Regions:
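Flexible, low-complexity linker and terminal segments
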Residues: 110-196
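Thiamine diphosphate
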Residues: 1-113, 118-120, 139-143, 155-156
């Protein structure tokens, strides 16, 4: 799910163009907060999900983002903020790297489009291992670059959505999706960052 804005729009457009053949659900959301909520819902149902937004959108989604980092994820969830250093096509600059530090979640910063593909794949795997969202940060020059990317094998299995919510309250796999007490979650987040 995503919200349009340079330099992030092309990602959702590209995913939408292959959505039928790859069995992907892709949407333009009402705003960035809704996009993050839609992606989180997919993750809570044990599906991989991607939230695409520009730097201003991270601020729009920040209320939910703060809770999401505290409650954790189930299926791999990558949040892909596309930033515009120097405000080449935006009215201001933003830097989502501060959210990674504040929320104590992993941040990956690719330097070219092959790394962007590889790190996004790794971001999903890391998210599934750590049970938290992973930021994969892009910038204008990367978002608007083009070239050859080696995909490798694409997944062929069809994952089915499943949602459990009747387990132990602090069990991230079967319990309700809630933010646990801050002190408890803060310690867990620090362990996840060390593990990453």
């Amino acid at each position: 799910a995503g919200y349009p804005g340079t330099p992030s729009s092309e990602i959702v457009e590209s995913l939408a163009s292959v959505s039928k053949e790859r069995n992907l659900y892709v949407e333009w959301s009402t705003n960035e907060k809704v996009a993050m909520e839609v992606a989180a819902a997919g993750s809570f149902a044990n599906l991989r999900s991607l939230c695409v937004l520009k730097q201003n959108g991270v601020n729009v989604a920040s209320d939910f983002f703060l809770h999401l980092a505290g409650s954790g994820t189930r299926g791999g969830m990558v949040i892909l903020p596309c930033e515009d250093p120097g405000a080449l096509s935006s009215v201001n600059e933003g830097d989502s790297r501060h959210f990674s530090r504040m929320l104590e979640i992993p941040l990956l910063e690719p330097g070219d489009f092959q790394e962007a593909k590889d790190m996004t794949k790794w971001g999903f795997e890391l998210s599934e291992t750590l049970k938290c969202p992973v930021l994969v940060r892009s910038v204008t020059r990367l978002s608007h670059a083009s070239g050859t990317v080696t995909f490798g094998d694409l997944p062929t299995t069809e994952q089915q959505a499943t949602f459990k919510h009747d387990g132990f309250v602090l069990d991230p796999e079967t319990g309700p999706v809630i933010s646990a007490p801050v002190n408890y979650k803060h310690g867990l987040q620090q362990q996840k960052v060390q593990q990453a």
